[in-house]
Curated annotation (Swiss-Prot):
The modification Phosphoserine is found at S436. The keyword Cytoplasm applies. Residues 448-477, 513-533 have a biased composition (Pro residues). Expressed in the stratified squamous epithelial layers of the skin, esophagus and tongue. GO terms for cellular component: cytoplasm. Residues 448-533 are annotated as: Disordered. Its main location: cytoplasm. This is Keratinocyte proline-rich protein. InterPro entries: Keratinocyte_PR (IPR052881). It is found in: Cytoplasm. The keyword Thylakoid does not apply.
Length: 699
């Protein structure tokens, strides 16, 4: 059978019927209705091995025509009789008719297109009333063709049209991309089972796979056109999930080598990087869910631009839960405040970044100028670094310059940290940044020792825990600690500690003088009224400013108390950690230690600047800055400044004064990256130009 000899049959393509050759039934009928068919000499014949080994015989054309459908390995032949032919019936015995090859001029009625090329030979015959289809499985022979007509194989069918009827049998072996025949469309309805498909295998990897992929492709045929882009339909099916139809894939194909690869491409880009671009094109891909950075690629890319080196915004996580640039006025911050903690941001600028010790390592806090010094000379020269630090703290360059300043800072940090912690956002950074700052600056360690005493003054800062600001005001009292009376007022702040309350009497003393008006505000919380003094305490938060200038702060603070007191309260609301501040409140007892605070007094050099006064003035509400100062106050601690100041805002150079700090500085950015107390991108704050010798610090 041809299938058995498929290779042989298909092999000698040239042996197949030559295109242009024609053969037709001889005009000489033979007995038994056998017809001798003459064909061109060059024509090869196939022998059909079948139960009835009979060559197709055609009688002179009768009213009906017989069409023989021969499936041959090399070719299929369609034979139509131009004249009416009588139906040949297969007897139990079939006679064989050998086709004589002698070339006859008379043989012209049948055209045989070379099956090797077209795989189909068409025979055109005037339409007979009936057409008989005879199937014979030819076996390849060089010279003879045997056609058998089992009676059962005859299927009478009316001719489809008055024109010519074409009958094709897809040949088994040879499919050279000629897969489509004019008649093929009869079968084309679905390649459900087209043996010939194997022939067109050149075009289709396999018809079976096509069916599988048909879910995505309405037809296999489209694959022909799309084929160049698709290795095989099977693969398309896999990608099908991503694309409604692979047909569209073709367009997108340019970016993706294949559908399945696209799915894999999701790995390279959280979502396929191309998908971000093509996201409009593709509603959504299963792969997109893979995007880890963001629900959508686009935002993540935006994040990257917004934070050039802020890959570690994790430090700023408090601020950027989703790393959305909008929350942090990233535009204003080349680096998220956290980046300073994430030295990696400054890796290029600060080789020391890696090491925990050394302010240079703080370079990461580049966001905070104080840290910017050695590591980040570009942002701020080392000399600036100290200067910048005071601006953040609102104190003075002198403090940052002096390791002692750092000493005070540690204490302030403990105290201030509670303050900062109340702010949900900052506390995290505070924790981290202070730690990092400690690591970075070994100097602070010594500072803590002296500062333990100052720390009590920060404890008044815990009074700020009431940051309703009343408590912060008490912190200023610790600054006034030189004013023993104010110190008791911090105790009042711990008001839970009634014992310290006795000191409140001193507090009233400051109250009448500094803030008679503040008292009304404290009146909402009468005890907080002393807090107005604590309001100056926020300058302490600013770092050691209040500590450095406790008296100035306290003096002005009482006055500021009235206005800021109400405002701070909302901020305390933001600060959930006030409890921590109360913890320092015990330190408020150390508040008597304000004497250590005089140590900051060296830093008090800023006092002349009156910046502390400015701090209180915000506290007092004299400055529109008060809220920013509250931030400043929280940030007042040098340690916290590292964490808070920059995160909350950046200093604008525009504010510069010989007096270390001048209120009215503009901070751009939100108070806290966390969004705590975010009040817009600009904030007024202390700007230290003269102290640091720098106009301003950029975060």
């Amino acid at each position: 059978m041809c299938d058995q000899q498929e290779i042989q049959c298909c092999g000698p393509i040239p042996q197949c019927c030559v295109k242009g050759s024609s053969f037709g039934p001889s005009q000489f009928p033979y007995a038994n209705n056998q017809v001798l068919v003459e064909a061109p000499c060059e024509m090869q014949f196939l022998e059909c091995a079948a139960p009835c080994p009979i060559q197709v015989s055609q009688t002179p054309c009768q009213s009906s025509t017989t069409e023989v459908k021969g499936q041959a390995p090399c070719k299929t032949t369609n034979v139509k009789c131009q004249t009416k032919t009588t139906q040949v019936k297969c007897q139990p015995k079939t006679t064989e008719i050998k086709c004589q090859a002698p070339c006859q001029a008379q043989v012209s009625c049948v055209q045989c297109q070379a099956p090797c090329q077209s795989q189909v030979s068409y025979v055109q015959v005037p339409q007979p009333p009936q057409t008989y289809y005879v199937e014979c499985a030819p076996v390849y022979y060089t010279e003879t063709r045997f056609v058998e007509y089992p009676v059962s194989n005859y299927v009478p069918v009316p001719a489809p049209q008055p024109g010519y009827t074409y009958v094709e049998c897809p040949s088994l072996g040879q499919g050279q991309g000629q897969g489509s025949f004019s008649t093929r469309y009869q079968y084309q309805g679905s390649y459900g089972s087209c043996t010939s498909q194997s022939q067109s295998r050149g075009s289709y990897s396999s018809c079976g796979p096509q069916h599988q992929s048909q879910a995505s492709y309405s037809y296999c045929e489209p694959q022909f056109q799309s084929r160049p882009s698709y290795t095989n339909c099977g693969t398309q099916r896999q990608s099908q999930a991503s694309f409604g139809s692979c047909t569209s894939q073709l367009q997108s194909r340019a970016s993706y080598s294949n559908c399945s690869s696209q799915r894999r491409s999701g790995t390279s880009f959280s979502t396929c990087a191309p998908q971000c671009q093509g996201q409009g094109t593709y509603g959504s891909f299963t792969a997109q869910r893979k995007s880890q950075s963001a629900s959508r690629c686009l935002p993540s890319r935006r994040l990257q631009p917004s934070y050039r080196s802020c890959s570690p915004p994790r430090h700023s996580e408090p601020c950027y839960s989703s790393c959305l640039p909008s929350r942090c006025s990233s535009g204003s911050y080349n680096y998220c405040t956290p980046p300073r903690r994430s030295e990696p941001i400054y890796g290029s600028h600060c080789s020391p970044r890696g090491r925990p010790s050394g302010c240079s390592q703080r370079c990461g806090p580049k966001c905070r100028i104080e840290i910017s010094s050695p590591c980040c000379p570009r942002q701020v020269p080392p000399q600036r670094c100290p200067v910048q630090i005071p601006p953040i703290r609102g104190r003075s360059r002198s403090c940052p310059r002096q390791p002692s300043w750092g000493v005070s800072c540690p204490d302030l940090r403990p105290c201030a940290e509670p303050h900062a912690f109340p702010r949900p956002c900052r506390p995290q950074r505070l924790d981290r940044s202070p730690e990092s700052s400690w690591r970075r600056c070994p100097v602070p360690a010594p500072r803590p020792y002296p500062r333990p005493e100052p720390c009590p003054s920060p404890e008044p800062r815990p009074c700020p825990r009431p940051r309703p600001r009343p408590e912060p005001c008490p912190s200023p009292e610790p600054r006034p600690r030189p004013r023993p009376d104010p110190c008791p007022s911090p105790e009042l702040r711990p008001r839970p500690r009634p014992e310290p309350c006795p000191s409140p009497e001193p507090r009233p003393r400051p109250r009448p003088d500094p803030c008679p008006s503040p008292e009304p505000r404290p009146r909402p919380c009468p005890e907080p009224c002393p807090s107005p003094e604590p309001r100056p305490c926020p300058p302490l938060r600013r770092f050691s400013e209040p500590c450095l200038y406790p008296e100035p702060c306290s003096v002005s603070k009482p006055v500021p108390c009235p206005v800021p007191c109400p405002a701070p309260h909302p901020r305390p609301v933001h600060c959930e950690t006030p409890g921590r501040r109360p913890q320092p409140s015990p330190r408020s007892q150390p508040c008597p230690h304000p004497e250590p605070m005089p140590r900051p007094v060296p830093c008090s050099s800023p006092v002349p600047c009156g910046d502390p006064i400015h701090c209180p003035s915000p506290c007092s509400g004299h400055n529109p800055v008060p809220y920013s100062q509250e931030l400043g106050c929280h940030e007042s601690n040098p340690c916290r400044l590292d964490t808070e100041g920059p995160s909350s805002y950046s200093f604008s150079q525009g504010q510069e004064s010989n007096g270390c700090c001048v209120s009215g500085g503009v901070f751009s950015g939100s108070r806290g990256l966390s969004g705590c107390g975010d009040q817009g991108n600009t904030y007024r704050g202390m700007n230290c130009g003269a102290c640091g010798g720098t106009q301003g610090a950029y975060f």
